[in-house]
Amino acid sequence: MAIDRRREAAGGGPGRQPAPAEENGSLPPGDAAASAPLGGRAGPGGGAEIQPLPPLHPGGGPHPSCCSAAAAPSLLLLDYDGSVLPFLGGLGGGYQKTLVLLTWIPALFIGFSQFSDSFLLDQPNFWCRGAGKGTELAGVTTTGRGGDMGNWTSLPTTPFATAPWEAAGNRSNSSGADGGDTPPLPSPPDKGDNASNCDCRAWDYGIRAGLVQNVVSKWDLVCDNAWKVHIAKFSLLVGLIFGYLITGCIADWVGRRPVLLFSIIFILIFGLTVALSVNVTMFSTLRFFEGFCLAGIILTLYALRIELCPPGKRFMITMVASFVAMAGQFLMPGLAALCRDWQVLQALIICPFLLMLLYWSIFPESLRWLMATQQFESAKRLILHFTQKNRMNPEGDIKGVIPELEKELSRRPKKVCIVKVVGTRNLWKNIVVLCVNSLTGYGIHHCFARSMMGHEVKVPLLENFYADYYTTASIALVSCLAMCVVVRFLGRRGGLLLFMILTALASLLQLGLLNLIGKYSQHPDSGMSDSVKDKFSIAFSIVGMFASHAVGSLSVFFCAEITPTVIRCGGLGLVLASAGFGMLTAPIIELHNQKGYFLHHIIFACCTLICIICILLLPESRDQNLPENISNGEHYTRQPLLPHKKGEQPLLLTNAELKDYSGLHDAAAAGDTLPEGATANGMKAM
């Protein structure tokens, strides 16, 4: 009776509602039955667990809370990684390997498109036609610093209003003996003088990106029209952002394959039309739609690649696709030098997507998505197609996947939209944390890139366009190689935390320590000089670019793993759109002539500190089965970053540990004496 009174005081008496779900992500027993673990752990390295099924009722029948699970499909069919994928041979099947290879090949074409702005919109040296190239050195010019560097954002350009007059003057004076018609160096002009210097009817250009003509030189996007270059950069990024959000939702509703194929068709239409643009307005508008379609291709291929792989192979197969895209980045300068004209380059970038039209006949729908959305009739046909391609005997179905599938053929499909995540307890928090991480990583990358390239006058190596380009590409390559090693030993959450700490340290040291060095450098006896400050700044910038690239890439991959299959494309769309917003800060700062850059850096530095705390709230998904529905995703609970010591009891007990305590009430009602040390919550530890 004492136990009954304690139960009623705790809210368990008659007429009372059951307690809400626990804070660590577990659901009440009624909901847990419908979302039981599908295969449990797939490997020893994970920290997140999906809660097991509730036990049978002591009377022999089903537990009362299991009644809601009567309408649910067979758990064998929802256990894709534990039942369906092994039946198909895992990644060992020849057909699965072919499909993975088909997701790698387009990454090269995607790399070409992502890095094309560095060449199409590079701001060249320019001077008034007829005045001779020497006029360029007299300050009637602007020297751009390249367009988009890397798949993050565009590197800063020096607008005309802030052109380096002193450096140009030194070059002009030194070359005055050779060029007798070179006019004397004017004093740094004010705003009105810049307008008069731009009063020219025709321009000559010195393009540094391997092309004879690009978008800037074709339509004279200099001086008063220079802002249109940044709008053109906006158009592709804004198209990517909207594309990620919209195509992600559509792919969860109609499937990955239709979105992929329609995106291929329309990127061919819009991409080839870009090369036929008659003015910069048409160019920018078509680039928006090109970015929209490119987002659909990137997102669906990423999801298909994840859903094809078993737990132990997901990360490495994703990284191979990243390396293929980087190969496109490294090959772009040679492609530009081969084409010579921006229209030919644009057409050559888009034409390889013609090969992807063959995917309509050779690339199937995601079997994992068909099973998760209960489209069992289509799933059965696809399973038989897989067994035929792999030359497998369907009679080798030990677990009985095909018989269970035939029992569920009459079930109606159950599709889910990403907006359903708003009603969850843990899943929406995980997605928001990863969106903020992605936004911070991609956004602060521009701060580090601008800081490093801002020393190009003092570092001769960085004055060259190709040196800038390949330096950024090499940092990204080294970052991906480091990710492979770190994630292998520390897992997804540990690796993300390490790279975010490095990003925060590089940012804070660059903002704080360099200002301190700058103060000491004013004293001649301090031993500090501006060269020391510049070297520290370049070092911190390289470390920051290295770490922030890993943060952004790992956040996207992490989101793809912890988001359930039924809304995976929608979740990926959110985190990729956040990355796009981070990239968008670069052309915004450039459009305002670098005004607000320091505040921009401070804001992102503060975000890194917030992200370090929030990363600890994420689950660990290494070697875990992918969640198939929203209930599975809710059961990915956060665990301590370091494992428990042997014999140490965790503070928060799971449902699996609490389920055996229900017999205490029956024992007390029967008048049995409780053993010594028994309590209402179980046995007291001795």
From Swiss-Prot:
Keywords: Glycoprotein, Ion transport, Membrane, Transmembrane, Transmembrane helix, Transport. The keyword Disulfide bond does not apply. Residues 1-62, 169-193 are annotated as: Disordered. Glycans are attached at residues 24, 279. InterPro entries: MFS_dom, MFS_sugar_transport-like, MFS_trans_sf, Sugar_transporter_CS. One of its GO terms (cellular component) is plasma membrane. It is a multi-pass membrane protein. It comes from the Eukaryota. GO terms for biological process: monoatomic ion transport. One of its GO terms (molecular function) is transmembrane transporter activity. The keyword Magnesium does not apply. Gene3D superfamilies: MFS general substrate transporter like domains. The chain crosses the membrane at residues 234-254, 258-278, 288-308, 315-335, 344-364, 467-487, 494-514, 538-558, 569-589, 598-618. It is found in: Membrane. Belongs to the major facilitator (TC 2.A.1) superfamily. Organic cation transporter (TC 2.A.1.19) family. This is Solute carrier family 22 member 23. The lineage of its organism: Eukaryota, Metazoa, Chordata, Craniata, Vertebrata.
